[in-house]
């Protein structure tokens, strides 16, 4: 029933994803395993390697970015709460629960909205960039140096029009283009973009 509601946009939206480790020795995907929303690791032969199981339909990973050497930047949810760890250590051969991964509670974030994590480079330094939606319908961009759990910089976006995070990418001129869903006049959902210049990005991590 939950999967049908996800497909038909009539219920909870689950953060399905597929990724691969930098060493290309494991595939990581979010899906259902033993009736729980789980993060599953497959080895290079596509055989089961390990799993971090969620709490049925109410907990699990929201997003994950493999950094290499068993390090991951991740966000996870538990009911209406969101937790983040930009430098978590996960074993691809573990059989464990997602809620047991040490993470920082982010009380302001909306667990029902997408969370995106990508590698970006600013001034030749790599960062794990988290883009999420707050419960007050703003966007928040958080930057961590690759593998570090210490916040390097952050920025809130949107204070008059409700926004929801959709995607983001570095532009050719070194800026950041953010794709978002904007709710106009409290009723109409529209696609919108927000551009941060190269200089604005650099100022976040100075």
Where are these regions (language model features)?
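A short loop-to-beta-strand structural motif that recurs across blades of beta-propeller domains
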Residues: 36-41, 84-89, 138-142, 189-195
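Short loop/turn segments that connect beta-strands within beta-propeller blades
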Residues: 42-47, 91-94, 144-149, 197-199
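A short beta-strand motif characteristic of beta-propeller blades
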Residues: 2-9, 48-55, 97-109, 150-158
